[in-house]
Amino acid sequence: MKKQTVKIIVAGAAGRMGRTILSLAYRDPAIQIAGAFERADNPSVGRDVGELIGSSPINVPVHPDLRECIQSG
């Protein structure tokens, strides 16, 4: 049976819980980080998710709202 990859979008990506979820998802081959978003005034907007979790860039930027996040992914 073929294993499926679950795509996730994380809200509050720059917060403590958001970073923890992103870090755990990054290490799990069954999960693909499809997007992440934060409040528009958060300094993490525009940064790569990999930077938030202390890894190399993964080409997933932090967006300022959910709609933009969904449209990009």
Model-inferred region functions:
Residues 1-6, 67:
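A short, basic/flexible loop-to-alpha-helix module at the beginning of a structural domain
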Residues 13, 37-40, 65-66:
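Fold-independent oxyanion-binding glycine-rich loops
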